Amino acid sequence: MSIEPDISPSPDTPAPIEAKVSPMMEQYHEIKAANPGLLLFYRMGDFYELFFEDAEIAARALGITLTKRGKHKGQDIPMCGVPVERSDDYLHRLIALGHRVAVCEQTEDPAAARARKSVVRRDVVRLITPGTLTEDTLLDARANNYLLAIARARASAGADRIGLAWIDISTAEFIVTECAPAELAATLARINPNEAIVTDALYSDPELGPLLRELPAVTPLTRDVFDSATAERRLCDYFAVATMDGLSAMSRLEATAAAACVTYIDRTQLGKKPPLSPPSREATGSTMAIDPATRANLELTRTLSGERRGSLLDAIDCTVTAAGSRLLAQRLAAPLTDVEQIAQRLDAVAALLPDPGLREALRATLRAAPDMSRALARLSVGRGGPRDLAALRDGLLAADQALAQLGALEVPPKEIQTAMAALRRPSRDLAQEFSRALADDLPLMKRDGGFVREGYHDALDETRKLRDDSRLIVAAMQARYADDCGVKGLKIRHNNVLGYFVEVTAQHGDKLMAPPLNLTFIHRQTLAGQTRFTTAELGEIEAKIANAGDRALGLELEIFERLVALVQAATDDLRAAAHGFAALDVTLALAKLAVDDNYVRPEVDGSLSFAIEGGRHPVVEQALRRDGQPFIANACDLSPGPGQQSGQIWLITGPNMAGKSTFLRQNALIALLAQIGSFVPASRARIGIVDRLFSRVGAADDLARGRSTFMVEMVETAVILNQASERALVILDEIGRGTATFDGLSIAWAAIEHLHESNRCRSLFATHYHELTALSAKLPRLFNATVRVKEWHGDVVFLHEVLPGSADRSYGIQVAKLAGLPPSVITRAKSVLAKLEAQDRGQSARALAEDLPLFAVTARAAAEPSPPSEAERLIEALKALHPDELSPREALDALYALKAKLGKA
């Protein structure tokens, strides 16, 4: 979904202001004109209201009533509104749909506006866009929220390059990289941005524009945001460094994208600069390349229906913290290609396996640790509250506990040592200060007050006492005055005119007006039966009581800002500790997964090996286990070199439902798990680094692009054949279906030869074209495998075992019978199949059509099902007999009945 650019008036900008327009609507027009392309949430009392086209868009998106408020140019003004107290829910829904919102608040008290005889002042206090969120209520705790900037450099020689920078301001992550235009789709699928910013030219580009418009939200911006000449200066200004030497080494194109990111953040945060980590450069080729189709087909983070449940991430996510879940998703999106880094992660998982007590103790500690990264981000942009301070306090206390528990490891592996060092970085003085300062029960918002612990600040305690104990203070003063004056009936009262005053009966009034009491008591009012006085002390107390509530809140807010300043001074250390928690959580989660699901440590090296023994599908295995069923494990060896079951291309035949697709996917997932540093579902695994993973498994129409299922399949196959190197792992399922049989067979045949001779990569190729198995005679690295089935009383039993050899039948009719096709259709299909199999290959299509008048049969079947032949009736009757269940007499009767039917036939 695309969002209107913010560089010129958008279609939803109201028409020029006419002469007779209300002051409120005039103010609205001015604010709206300054924020084109955004939905304006305009504060009106307890509601945010939207007008004109904004109202129409929001009403449709939110399913709320569209009404009207007044007129503009003689036309009703469309209006809708949402309650302020529920606005986060509505904002979340709008942002999820890719909209951007400007929140306009009242910035003065309505009473002050009335005194000025003017409309209440309002200003935009927040620009909310899909890629710049920090609030918990708007974020998915288990997923990163990335803003991505894309810059392109044109080259006359045709070597165009794309610079990318992506930021999650809720966690301060900042990453840059470069890629070729052909690699952009795979890179976008890996980053999975919530919002992308691009130039107008790139957004309109005929080649890349359609790809960009598939993203959840795209915001085109003016060229100055992507000005490479000013990029370095803008980055230096943001990070407050003199030169780029203080930041990571970046190419000019990467710096351009990075500068666009920080410029956009500066605009949307209205000048507030959330602290970001210095840009980290991702080296080209450091992660496994996975194109969008492969990510979707393998259901890495979402199923094909868009659900997290049922995906690979859902199956392996045993983390106990939101930050850990986000980091695991990041690793799954970008498996490593560096053998040493993978080994370090595997070492860390292995180190935690022998001690289940330590694992569970650490997981319990982490479970109590809040999301420090996002608390830190909210505090840094002024949107944090007392609970965010408490989150940092609790995180630091949990860090101490985790470090003490990790002391049980004699020699922690490097990955765990790094996490421990990160947990040690913040000063524990911060946790102690927060423990002293923060109350036990904390409000959500700082404006509610009551979050500073009693005894932390003397002046605050005194002010609170004055606020909370005003009655006791006045009562004590009344008793003292009564004693001093010798007037037992003296009272201190209050009204809105005089405020606090001393009241005595008329007969005692003269006494208070005579020396020496007249020096203390000042006459204010004489009534028929009472005389009223005030005192300087009472005036002071009245002022203190009147202002005590405001003063108490003011003091608390001062304390809050001082504590936030302590946080900002320790931002880098706190961020490091938060990442240490996340890394430790992922390691513990993978250790738990390995133990619970019986995974083994893979051998990952720089070879071209791919040898799996006892491999299993991680998601399917869990689903079967829940139903009390076992998963049938299978071996796979795509390693180069001679071997009985070794070939770099496996050609797999067998019926539908037998498990071919599961076998293909499980081997791809095993490779992926190994390269994120996880143990794998197998009894043994040796995997040479896979640099690109390709999957063409399943397809559907792409109606939006005018592509049929077959066209989608061919496009995906073309990508594989054009891009797969010898280090790639390719899984292909049913290439060539969806067109004429011989066309499809020819395409599949040629694709296998291309994989064998040109790509020379490790491949799994499932097919129903049994003729392809003959290729193994001329392609030395092609190995035939089949999925074992067994026939029983005319039905097929799937054994889900992958063995050497090839299938001679597809068992399609048996599968159709299992699916519940009508018996008449199954019977007719068997008849047609028998005749087809009896045909000579050289027989003409016309002769075949004459022998099998299919259209005539179809026409007749539409009126009434064609009855089975007598021979077919006899066969079905025989199948229905169960000799072991018949008595001798019943068996004899059945035989006579069959003979009688045969005679009639």
UniProtKB/Swiss-Prot annotation:
InterPro entries recorded: DNA_mismatch_repair_MutS (IPR005748), DNA_mismatch_repair_MutS-lik_N (IPR007695), DNA_mismatch_repair_MutS/MSH (IPR017261), DNA_mismatch_repair_MutS_C (IPR000432), DNA_mismatch_repair_MutS_clamp (IPR007861), DNA_mismatch_repair_MutS_core (IPR007696), DNA_mismatch_repair_MutS_N (IPR016151), DNA_mismatch_repair_MutS_sf (IPR036187)
Cellular component annotations (GO), alphabetically ordered: cytosol
Pfam families named in the record: MutS_I (PF01624), MutS_II (PF05188), MutS_III (PF05192), MutS_IV (PF05190), MutS_V (PF00488)
Keywords tagged on the record: ATP-binding, DNA damage, DNA repair, DNA-binding, Nucleotide-binding
Keyword Iron-sulfur attributed: no
Region (Disordered): 272-292
Residues involved in ATP binding: G654, P655, N656, M657, A658, G659, K660, S661
Keyword Thylakoid: no
GO molecular function, one term: ATP-dependent DNA damage sensor activity
Biological processes annotated in GO: mismatch repair
SMART domains: MUTSac, MUTSd
UniProt record similarity statement: Belongs to the DNA mismatch repair MutS family.
Physiological role: This protein is involved in the repair of mismatches in DNA. It is possible that it carries out the mismatch recognition step. This protein has a weak ATPase activity.
Protein's UniProt name: DNA mismatch repair protein MutS
